[in-house]
From Swiss-Prot:
Gene Ontology terms: biological process: translation
Keywords, in A-Z order: Ribonucleoprotein, Ribosomal protein
Species of the source: Buchnera aphidicola subsp. Schizaphis graminum (strain Sg)
Region (Disordered): 105-130
Lineage: Bacteria, Pseudomonadati, Pseudomonadota, Gammaproteobacteria, Enterobacterales
Protein's UniProt name: Small ribosomal subunit protein uS9
NCBIfam families the record matches: PRK00132.1 (NF001099)
Entries under HAMAP family matching the protein: Ribosomal_uS9_B
Compositional bias per record (Basic residues), positions renumbered to this chain: 116-130
Amino acid sequence: MVKIQNYGTGRRKSSSARVFLRSGDGEITVNKRSLKDYFGRETSCMVVRQPLELVDMMNNFNIYITVKGGGVSGQAGAIRQGITRALIKYNHLLRSELRKSGFVTRDSRQVERKKVGFRKSRKRTQFSKR
């Protein structure tokens, strides 16, 4: 029996996610754990579910996700982009609706590196005139 699935890759900060959409009843599995167990925080779970709620397909797919790197927020954003790309492969007519909500575009913001002589990337020690 051949299983039909759609694949999407998502990236955010230093996280990357591989997302597989298969027809099912709405179960979301992240690194072999349920969505609630993996993230714990409801805000991250909401970010992951946003594209599905937008196109009203919450209970149409079982979603299998592997995600690596970064923290909780970056991983949630990477998964959201991966789900969006997989939905577009499933039905290209969803692209315009997803683009209007800003889910298709990769958020290219990265952490700015720390510079020599500074405490952080831009924070300096207090200036003393004398």
